[in-house]
Amino acid sequence: MAKVLVMAQVQDGMQWETSLRTHGDVFKTYGLLGPVQFAVSGNEVALCFETADAQAFLKTMNEPQTVEAMKVDGVKRETVKVYVLDKSVF
């Protein structure tokens, strides 16, 4: 099990959130273990995914359906940062 944090800039935060909520079919292909948590601050977004296989999840980030969903959502792909949360304090 792994948590993955994805951060990016979008063209319009409100439009991005509305569009994101329509991608249930895409998210089902990610092998997620729970709901997608996210935050929006202006034109910056952050999403947290819990997945069974971080490497498989990372591959899905470049699949055509994900790239197209990001395009529709107004994600500025050049700003996307992905972090696998693999360390803890406690």
Regions found by a protein language model. Name each.
Residues 1-90:
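Short S/T/G/P-rich N-terminal loop/turn motif that feeds into the first structured element of a domain
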